[in-house]
């Protein structure tokens, strides 16, 4: 008992005589434990946040892209598969848009309609969803080219040229990064952002006439959201 009492007396005496060193050691241990706890929980927190974000925006489980397109019969077959709850035929293609410094690439997406229940629902930053075939919503990143609501944007590719009126500025769940927008098959290969339109406004640029002739069907889609 005496030895134990003497031991603790010695410990506290040493601490009181070297407060600075004791405090430094304490802080090193505390910070190390805090950093370790943070790093250990970060993956789960990030995964949970991303999962919640994607669920809130009805992120599609699968995206099918066909070089020869999807007919209405193809869509019906996919829709009949076991476990498939929803199939959305649409267009996805690359295009170039003009600005004061030249032309840059964008990816164009489309759907039959835009509402709160759609798959891959864009998040409106400003404006509204398109309601007419000559209306579009644009990537918030395209604001650096001074595009604003009410302006028109001209898109072109090997299938032709079409002009759309900008009615909304959005973020899209398909792009988690605020910087990287992928690559483009046109121009210099870089992608500056995305533009989204209605299917009726996308068919002209999205469907290659040679593919339509090959399949003897001018009502084809280039991608399916499932």
Predicted regions and their residues:
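Membrane transport/envelope proteins' first extracytoplasmic loop
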Residues: 2-226
